[in-house]
Amino acid sequence: MPPPALPADIATVVSRAIAEDLRDGDLTAELIGRYTPAVARVVAREPATLCGRAWFDETFRQLDHRVSVSWHAADGDAIAADAIVCELRGPARSILTGERTALNFLQMLSGTATATRSLVDIVVGTHTRILDTRKTLPGLRLAQKYAVLCGGGDNHRIGLFDAILIKENHIVAVGSVTAAVAAARRQSPNVMIEVEVESLDELREALATDADRIMLDDFSLADMRGGVDLRNAHTGKRQSLEASGSVNAASLRAIAETGVDYVSIGAITKHVRAIDFSMRFA
């Protein structure tokens, strides 16, 4: 498993989350003595793929270094309902102040990882890989991209800066698939270039370009199979094929069995269902 995002990014998003919750202080936690010690346990209330340890830890590092966290599972691990995920020891005030912020990160990122894992499991036995998209929660892209990796998926481009994805409006503005890919290669010779196509005719045109990957946008299953056949018969540069658009769990297996290399699914980061975790004092 790669390291979770960038340490600076983790510190920044956690700091913002604490600030929006805490502001001038935790009025309720002040009811408890300043030096009252506590032991707390975080329990999963449903099966999940765990993700978010670094953000959870950073919350308490910023609030109070005296709070220690002992983990019983790693990011990417499958956890069962009622499993104890971690144990905290330290001042009760600080644990209570950080509880909601820390759990928010753990619940959201585990939700993304769990959703990804459920889709990855559907395509087991095929060579198709599941990709995320840029449809992420604002300010949390690197965190969610990491969660996708924890769930067994792959990252598409991180942003507009690290790869070129030529879509329909770009093609219309430039004039053609061929012209758009050629312009992209001249501009960025060492960057991955992907081009979106909406028909088999556009796919034929794209196969003759220097694109690295071709996105099949809203293709029917029959056209996907035809597209894979066209790619496999092509004697030039071998481009990977990515299916995109209107993909869900019910349609995913059939799409993977057409032979496409990737399926990109925005819902895994856009439609996040948080995993239910609770924290209880021992």
Model-derived features: where do they sit?
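Short secondary-structure boundary segments
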Residues: 218, 245, 267
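Short hydrophobic alpha-helical segments of the AMP-binding
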Residues: 231, 235
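Active-site loop ensemble at the mouth of alpha/beta enzyme cores that anchors a bound cofactor
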Residues: 278-282
